[in-house]
């Protein structure tokens, strides 16, 4: 099992609920750690990804209509939260990929 991890720390200001965040290029006001993470679609996001906000696991959804904590927006790695994010909030995105043994 391979795990790709992306960590974002909000360094300035708040982000309104349901605002799209590109986890690989979130723009100003964010500090980034880890590797880029992308999704092939909403199914891959909900089945292979765990998202944490300030250490608490968030319920992932395929779209805003799922009314979950965080939902898929685009394959580039864009997500949105159902709640406002604040300065110093830490977002962790863990994507799990099954690896096959060779030999």
Protein language model features and the residues they cover:
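Glycine-centered tight-turn motifs at strand-turn-strand junctions
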Residues: 65-67
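Extended beta-strand solenoid/passenger and fiber regions
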Residues: 1-63, 85-87, 92-103
């Amino acid at each position: 099992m391979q795990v790709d991890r992306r960590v974002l720390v909000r360094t300035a200001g708040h982000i309104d609920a349901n605002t799209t965040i590109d986890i690989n290029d979130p723009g100003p006001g964010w500090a980034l750690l880890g590797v880029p993470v992308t999704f092939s679609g909403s199914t891959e996001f909900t089945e292979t990804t765990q998202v944490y906000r300030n250490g608490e696991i968030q319920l992932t959804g395929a779209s805003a209509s799922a009314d979950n904590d965080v939902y898929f927006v685009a394959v580039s790695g864009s997500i949105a939260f159902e709640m406002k994010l604040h300065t110093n909030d830490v977002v962790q995105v863990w994507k799990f990929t099954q690896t096959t043994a060779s030999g």
